[in-house]
Amino acid sequence: MASLQQTLFSLQSKLPPSSFQIARSLPLRKTFPIRINNGGNAAGARMSATAASSYAMALADVAKRNDTMELTVTDIEKLEQVFSDPQVLNFFANPTITVEKKRQVIDDIVKSSSLQSHTSNFLNVLVDANRINIVTEIVKEFELVYNKLTDTQLAEVRSVVKLEAPQLAQIAKQVQKLTGAKNVRVKTVIDASLVAGFTIRYGESGSKLIDMSVKKQLEDIASQLELGEIQLAT
């Protein structure tokens, strides 16, 4: 099973850095005042996906207006790690826990993760609208919006052990060469099932795969063997 611990390595074009203006945050309540009830069927799932996309676009709009897109995507990466914990998701999904208590936990998350004020406001909007349950979907949608706005290619690298920065830089350069993207973000995941080596998934919705793992090599060897012809020594 893959480890939930993730790290991020970015390769970006050499452009002048943006001047981040954190002080001016637009209230998300005015930006996206909507609440959608989620049905327990396919239609409900589609509504949930639509809501996640809309919330993500609203947050991206605030980040663009504040010139804090890079800081906001960093916030999103932190939230991805926080809400990857099932206990956290279960806490916010529990209808017996009051909104006030959930807001207190949001405040703790904001402080411990050093999130921006508009990200904090965003999370509280989700709690008030009873949409915190789709935060992981919103994270994914925001990354898609960010990647499109910044011409960024996301590559997920899975390996048995943590790869060093020079190795990740080489992978980023290779993905950049293959895709022609201006920027490349490499997200790493520890996956012991690979035995050794690594895999790289990139492209739209991770449609392309480079598999350099020992697991893949063993599977290829196994598929070529005719096990019926193998005789074990006695």
UniProtKB/Swiss-Prot annotation:
The modification Phosphothreonine is found at T234. F(1)F(0) ATP synthase produces ATP from ADP in the presence of a proton or sodium gradient. F-type ATPases consist of two structural domains, F(1) containing the extramembraneous catalytic core and F(0) containing the membrane proton channel, linked together by a central stalk and a peripheral stalk. During catalysis, ATP synthesis in the catalytic domain of F(1) is coupled via a rotary mechanism of the central stalk subunits to proton translocation (Potential). Essential for photosynthesis, probably by facilitating electron transport in both photosystems I and II. This protein is part of the stalk that links CF(0) to CF(1). It either transmits conformational changes from CF(0) to CF(1) or is implicated in proton conduction. It is a peripheral membrane protein. Belongs to the ATPase delta chain family. Glycans are attached at N66. This is ATP synthase subunit delta, chloroplastic. The keyword Disulfide bond does not apply. The modification N-acetylserine is found at S48. It is found in: Plastid, Chloroplast thylakoid membrane. It comes from the Eukaryota. Residues 1-47 form a transit peptide. Keywords: Acetylation, ATP synthesis, CF(1), Chloroplast, Glycoprotein, Hydrogen ion transport, Ion transport, Membrane, Phosphoprotein, Photosynthesis, Plastid, Thylakoid, Transit peptide, Transport. GO terms for molecular function: mRNA binding; proton-transporting ATP synthase activity, rotational mechanism. F-type ATPases have 2 components, F(1) - the catalytic core - and F(0) - the membrane proton channel. F(1) has five subunits: alpha(3), beta(3), gamma(1), delta(1), epsilon(1). CF(0) has four main subunits: a(1), b(1), b'(1) and c(10-14). The alpha and beta chains form an alternating ring which encloses part of the gamma chain. F(1) is attached to F(0) by a central stalk formed by the gamma and epsilon chains, while a peripheral stalk is formed by the delta, b and b' chains. InterPro entries: ATP_synth_OSCP/delta_N_sf, ATPase_OSCP/d_CS, ATPase_OSCP/dsu. Disruption phenotype: Seedling lethal. High-chlorophyll (Chl)-fluorescence phenotype associated with an increase in non-photochemical quenching of Chl fluorescence and a higher de-epoxidation state of xanthophyll cycle pigments under low light. Impaired electron flow in photosystems I and II. Its main location: plastid. It holds the Pfam family OSCP. GO terms for biological process: photosynthesis; photosynthetic electron transport in photosystem I; photosynthetic electron transport in photosystem II; response to cold. The gene is ATPD. One of its GO terms (cellular component) is stromule.
